[in-house]
């Protein structure tokens, strides 16, 4: 391994050893030497991962942090992973996810021509681990592979103003499935109470800090990672009422305190038990009040996002319970002014359809193609359908904004959440931006 890794890939885990092990095996198939792997276990039984790692840890690229003598909150488990990292750039993924280590090569080429870039996001695919009795899903491999510069003002508007939201802000740029430069991380650590992660909802905590403190942002339409959803993950529970409630209960229990009792939330009557949008609203309200960061007029967009969150519940009884909870919160918030913007529609139990083939945006591929049973195995197939990382065009004169990059498709360019990555501020004629609802928050116990 090189003395100073280009990229540290951090993978924290808790009590999901079988998925953690498969993810580790998939990552280590890449022999790149300028990448460092930080694997942190936080499980009740330390022996499982300790035995698994006994020989693997001999790889000089690996830093393994075993379970300590007490269970850590997810926030503290992520914190120790960040402290253990040495790379010039850092990315976190979940223990049921995947990221392509060769993104390190793209990072090097980007910073050579645009040295002000401090955060890189990319398109990400979503994968549901196989479950008996459930149909295999599909992923869409995009045709576009542009790399563009993203204006900070657009990210601020999307994160804090809830501009054009899905059920989540369409800003991206967390350290989760995005790479953050060391200098930016250290500024965040110094300013925010000498911690990288201050809030239990670690991904959105960091995303807000990266957007507020970052100087230059870049986005690659070519995907470099895959969100995984195993039956024990929070993203798997989206749209399932009992799973959502149980995940929230475990999350609060392992955190050790109810973060919703924070003084900053006194007049914000939304609970994380309602779902991912309410959870994001809670952490964002804490950040707004604590650090005096705000954009006027965000409430209407937030109400629309809450409606989309509610619509993810396909069971009518679950939909009614969540809808009633949100309605009560909106009725008791700011005199009920924004209740009229919360208008969810029950979509019914829509049947799943197995789909594959070409669309205008890319190639749809079944997630079990070639017998794939893990994100890493599926990545082996779909990455062969995409341009190789070393062949992605990075202009020698520096990155340009979307409306300045003729090769970029505004229809395809996405940030996590499903909307365009942004422009220099000019309108883009004839480039529609269809929405997709793909929340992937790690608000849960790792």
What is the meaning of each model-derived region?
Residues 1-245:
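Nucleotide-sugar donor-binding/catalytic module of glycosyltransferases
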Residues 123, 223-446:
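C-terminal subregions of glycosyltransferases and related glycan-biosynthesis enzymes
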């Amino acid at each position: 391994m090189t003395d100073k890794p280009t990229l540290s890939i951090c993978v924290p885990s808790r009590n999901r050893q079988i998925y953690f092990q498969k993810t580790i095996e998939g990552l280590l198939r890449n022999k790149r030497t300028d990448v460092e792997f930080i694997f942190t276990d936080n499980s009740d039984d330390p022996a499982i991962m300790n035995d698994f790692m006994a020989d693997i840890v001999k790889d000089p690229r690996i830093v393994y942090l075993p379970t300590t003598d007490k269970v850590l909150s997810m926030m503290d488990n992520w914190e120790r992973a960040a402290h253990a990292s040495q790379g010039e750039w850092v990315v976190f993924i979940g223990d049921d996810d995947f990221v392509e280590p060769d993104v390190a090569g793209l990072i090097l080429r980007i910073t050579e021509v645009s040295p002000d870039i401090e955060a890189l996001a990319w398109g990400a695919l979503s994968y549901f681990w196989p479950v008996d009795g459930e149909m295999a899903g599909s992923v869409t491999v995009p045709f576009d592979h542009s790399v563009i510069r993203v204006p900070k003002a657009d990210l601020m508007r999307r994160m804090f103003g809830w501009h054009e939201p899905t059920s989540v802000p369409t800003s991206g740029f967390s350290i989760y499935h995005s790479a953050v430069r060391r200098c930016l991380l250290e500024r965040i650590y110094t300013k925010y109470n000498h911690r990288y992660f201050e809030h239990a909802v670690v991904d959105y905590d960091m995303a807000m800090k990266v957007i507020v403190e970052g100087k230059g942002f870049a986005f690659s339409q070519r995907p470099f990672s895959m969100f995984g959803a195993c039956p024990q993950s929070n993203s798997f529970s989206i749209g399932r009422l009992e799973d959502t409630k149980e995940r929230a209960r475990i999350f609060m229990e392992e955190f050790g305190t109810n973060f919703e009792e924070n003084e900053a939330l006194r007049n914000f009557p939304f609970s994380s038990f309602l779902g991912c949008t309410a959870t994001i609203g809670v952490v964002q309200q804490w950040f707004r009040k604590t650090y005096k960061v705000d954009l006027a007029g965000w409430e209407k967009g937030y109400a629309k996002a809450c409606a989309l969150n509610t619509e993810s519940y396909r069971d009518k009884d679950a939909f009614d319970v969540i809808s009633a909870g949100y309605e009560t919160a909106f009725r008791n918030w700011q005199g009920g002014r924004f209740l009229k913007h919360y208008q969810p529609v029950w979509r019914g139990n829509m049947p799943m359809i197995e789909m594959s083939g070409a669309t205008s945006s890319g190639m749809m591929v079944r997630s079990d193609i070639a017998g794939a049973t893990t994100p890493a195995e599926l990545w082996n197939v779909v990455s062969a359908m995409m341009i190789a990382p070393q062949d992605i065009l990075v202009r020698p004169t520096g990155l340009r904004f979307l409306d300045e990059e003729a090769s970029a498709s505004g229809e395809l360019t996405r940030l996590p959440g499903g909307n365009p990555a942004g422009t220099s501020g000019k309108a883009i004629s004839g480039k529609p931006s269809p929405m997709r609802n793909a929340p992937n928050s790690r608000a849960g116990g790792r």
